Amino acid sequence: GTGNVSLGARGNLTTWQIFNQPGQMNRMPYTFFSIWMKQDGGEAISRVLESKLNPPFNRSQGFFRNEVAGLPRFDSSVMTTKYPFVNIEFRDEEIPVQISLEAYTPFIPLNAKDSGIPGAYLNYKVKNTTKENIEISIAGSMNNAVGFEGYNNFSFMKHAGDRENEYRSDDVIRGIMYTGKNFSDKHITWGNMALSTTEKEEYITKKPLWYQGQWTDGGEDFWQDFSTDGRLNNESIYDQVGSNWAEKSDFSFL
């Protein structure tokens, strides 16, 4: 088979069994979709395209930072299914639009080859229910898991080698291509991944790499970038004279 990824009733992507072996509990860090909206004359609103996390909240370390549990989410969601489609309606009284997700994998009767394409389509639909103009932007974030070998004590993925992210574009689709390097192509988790869209190039902004800092710097940088204007800067640039805090040092000195 081609493995599978599960879509939870909150709108969350979970159970990533795509590494040529069972992985019922596999989680993909920093992998989610977000929406930004701004009504004429109003304040910008941003949400992760999931409903709020559910209890019990009983893990000894709480949520790991790669789960971005502190980012704002929708009040509730409703899932309905009609094979091969899954539909999720997101609900929040503060949101001036109706938002839903239609997700499916290729299913073509009498065509086993194309029905087995290892990919999924996620179509987010937004309807303006007001009389005002509303600007909308949707962003997707997905971790490069090529070479996945398990998790460390803090739920971060371990990899067989290095990873590379590259923006690619052609006449049909454009997006981020995920590959690996410096390990054997015979490794059980060797391969590639992609996060792509059919949107026109002129409407796309991208951030192929997250900011490499300490603790939650990468997630905070992404969210501040996106929630400000609904667009992504290609790179994060910070001027920190006399300080290595945003690098990989454990201490900062002035």
Spans of model-derived segments:
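Short, mixed charged/polar active-site loops
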Residues: 43-44, 96-98, 133
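Short linear motifs in intrinsically disordered
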Residues: 23-26, 74-81, 164-168
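Short Pro-Gly-centered flexible turn/kink motifs
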Residues: 2, 134-136, 254
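Extended, loop-rich substrate-binding clefts of extracytoplasmic carbohydrate-active enzymes
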Residues: 55-119, 214-253
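A generic structural signal for short, non-catalytic loop/turn and secondary-structure boundary residues
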Residues: 28, 81-83, 92-94, 169-171, ...
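Polysaccharide-binding surfaces and accessory modules of carbohydrate-active proteins
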Residues: 101, 106-231
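Beta-strand-rich N-terminal accessory domains
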Residues: 1-55
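Short polybasic amphipathic segments
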Residues: 30-39, 53-63, 86-88, 174-176
